[in-house]
Amino acid sequence: MALTTKPHHLQRSFLSPSRVSGERYLESAPSCLRFRRSGVQCSVVAKECRVKGVKARQIIDSRGNPTVEVDLITDDLYRSAVPSGASTGIYEALELRDGDKSVYGGKGVLQAIKNINELVAPKLIGVDVRNQADVDALMLELDGTPNKSKLGANAILGVSLSVCRAGAGAKGVPLYKHIQETSGTKELVMPVPAFNVINGGSHAGNSLAMQEFMILPVGATSFSEAFQMGSEVYHTLKGIIKTKYGQDACNVGDEGGFAPNVQDNREGLVLLIDAIEKAGYTGKIKIGMDVAASEFFMKDGRYDLNFKKQPNDGAHVLSAESLADLYREFIKDFPIVSIEDPFDQDDWSSWASLQSSVDIQLVGDDLLVTNPKRIAEAIKKQSCNALLLKVNQIGTVTESIQAALDSKAAGWGVMVSHRSGETEDNFIADLSVGLASGQIKTGAPCRSERLSKYNQLLRIEEELGNVRYAGEAFRSP
């Protein structure tokens, strides 16, 4: 059978996420769409910059819960999906759920979908997608609440992400380049991946109180080498865990890390050291932790490291001062370079005390919730020295970029992050490169919703060629 030549627009090579002909989509709205990828090349004829349509739907995330997906149509279709967290900060923008316990246990997002299709979509028709800040401001005005509770942050974010992709497509540049230009970032930098290889806390069914035990290949010379190092340590760790705890202990948590049934957090760190050494990367791979301490903070100001077992005898309850001493012991005994959320989101004094006594990176997640106001307060109180950037905590691309810029201006590090409930959407990979954040965490080198981000970073590095890897300078790339 003779081969026919594909139309020129289907031959082009694109890196960033999916799009199809917008006109064809509007005419027939087929259930199965042929995609081409937005970003790397652009035709001689300028692409249409105006919104012609917006369509939202309910899809399912990696934990089996509903989430929002948004198609935005110009000449092409740009699709984005919204993540969701398990351990969420009380100051995050509101994730709108339906609350009907008879449908998806109350976790449906049909109201958020309705808000997009009936309230947001009509307002965006004819809007120029290259003006990200203007589009986001329009949605914030339409919502009119401090925490995006009218439309839902998950509704607003889905549209905002698709607008950003459409802006890149309209300009004929990769998504990461569009983000670089939008944010005013001088140099593109490949981030150090923080692989979450042991899961605890709210992400796993074991007894570990602390949520994430991560490895950071700071000694690599490229992202691809860093990924190889992380993958090899991950598989080495699996062998160690299988030998020590049995096959069942090799089951993975929400983010692809192993969840061995150990309670002693120090034991988790020893497992990492053993795997790093056995894989041959001692000195080249450092350790990071996400404690997620708000999950086990008690009303009396203490912290229960056995919070998963209720009731318990209180033997593992520590004061904030004792918990800080435990962190300092960990830092002394292990090559730890980063600790996230070591204390509760409102325990400002404990944050500041630890910050003044250690020289590692202290990352604010629940403390900051990617909110410029919380960031400003933390800068004033000298509570931490790095931002965990989660786009769904704040709800728009514009505010996410501003949070990163404010943090960098204060001399902080910026770690772009996924959520435990993820999709195949890989926006944050381009975001990390475009902002030159220097570091990203998006789970273990396992589970497709995690690898979609890492694989996108491999593609970006391949396309950019001689691009700098943040390495040891991940805090200030």
Swiss-Prot record:
<feature type="binding site">
    <location>
        <begin position="417"/>
        <end position="420"/>
    </location>
    <ligand>
        <name>substrate</name>
    </ligand>
</feature>
<keyword id="KW-0597">Phosphoprotein</keyword>
<feature type="binding site">
    <location>
        <position position="212"/>
    </location>
    <ligand>
        <name>substrate</name>
    </ligand>
</feature>
<dbReference type="Pfam" id="PF03952">
    <property type="entry name" value="Enolase_N"/>
</dbReference>
<dbReference type="GO" id="GO:0009507">
    <property type="term" value="C:chloroplast"/>
</dbReference>
<dbReference type="GO" id="GO:0009570">
    <property type="term" value="C:chloroplast stroma"/>
</dbReference>
<keyword id="KW-0150">Chloroplast</keyword>
<dbReference type="InterPro" id="IPR020809">
    <property type="entry name" value="Enolase_CS"/>
</dbReference>
<feature type="active site" description="Proton acceptor">
    <location>
        <position position="390"/>
    </location>
</feature>
<feature type="binding site">
    <location>
        <position position="340"/>
    </location>
    <ligand>
        <name>substrate</name>
    </ligand>
</feature>
<feature type="modified residue" description="Phosphoserine">
    <location>
        <position position="476"/>
    </location>
</feature>
<keyword id="KW-0809">Transit peptide</keyword>
<keyword id="KW-0460">Magnesium</keyword>
<feature type="binding site">
    <location>
        <position position="203"/>
    </location>
    <ligand>
        <name>substrate</name>
    </ligand>
</feature>
<protein>
    <recommendedName>
        <fullName>Enolase 1, chloroplastic</fullName>
        <ecNumber>4.2.1.11</ecNumber>
    </recommendedName>
</protein>
<keyword id="KW-0324">Glycolysis</keyword>
<feature type="binding site">
    <location>
        <position position="441"/>
    </location>
    <ligand>
        <name>substrate</name>
    </ligand>
</feature>
<dbReference type="GO" id="GO:0010090">
    <property type="term" value="P:trichome morphogenesis"/>
</dbReference>
<keyword id="KW-0456">Lyase</keyword>
<dbReference type="InterPro" id="IPR020811">
    <property type="entry name" value="Enolase_N"/>
</dbReference>
<comment type="similarity">
    <text>Belongs to the enolase family.</text>
</comment>
<feature type="active site" description="Proton donor">
    <location>
        <position position="255"/>
    </location>
</feature>
<feature type="binding site">
    <location>
        <position position="365"/>
    </location>
    <ligand>
        <name>substrate</name>
    </ligand>
</feature>
<dbReference type="Pfam" id="PF00113">
    <property type="entry name" value="Enolase_C"/>
</dbReference>
<comment type="pathway">
    <text>Carbohydrate degradation; glycolysis; pyruvate from D-glyceraldehyde 3-phosphate: step 4/5.</text>
</comment>
<dbReference type="InterPro" id="IPR029017">
    <property type="entry name" value="Enolase-like_N"/>
</dbReference>
<feature type="binding site">
    <location>
        <position position="290"/>
    </location>
    <ligand>
        <name>Mg(2+)</name>
    </ligand>
</feature>
<keyword id="KW-0479">Metal-binding</keyword>
<dbReference type="InterPro" id="IPR000941">
    <property type="entry name" value="Enolase"/>
</dbReference>
<dbReference type="InterPro" id="IPR020810">
    <property type="entry name" value="Enolase_C"/>
</dbReference>
<feature type="transit peptide" description="Chloroplast">
    <location>
        <begin position="1"/>
        <end position="41"/>
    </location>
</feature>
<dbReference type="GO" id="GO:0004634">
    <property type="term" value="F:phosphopyruvate hydratase activity"/>
</dbReference>
<dbReference type="GO" id="GO:0006096">
    <property type="term" value="P:glycolytic process"/>
</dbReference>
<dbReference type="GO" id="GO:0000015">
    <property type="term" value="C:phosphopyruvate hydratase complex"/>
</dbReference>
<keyword id="KW-0934">Plastid</keyword>
<dbReference type="InterPro" id="IPR036849">
    <property type="entry name" value="Enolase-like_C_sf"/>
</dbReference>
<feature type="binding site">
    <location>
        <position position="340"/>
    </location>
    <ligand>
        <name>Mg(2+)</name>
    </ligand>
</feature>
<feature type="binding site">
    <location>
        <position position="365"/>
    </location>
    <ligand>
        <name>Mg(2+)</name>
    </ligand>
</feature>
<dbReference type="GO" id="GO:0000287">
    <property type="term" value="F:magnesium ion binding"/>
</dbReference>
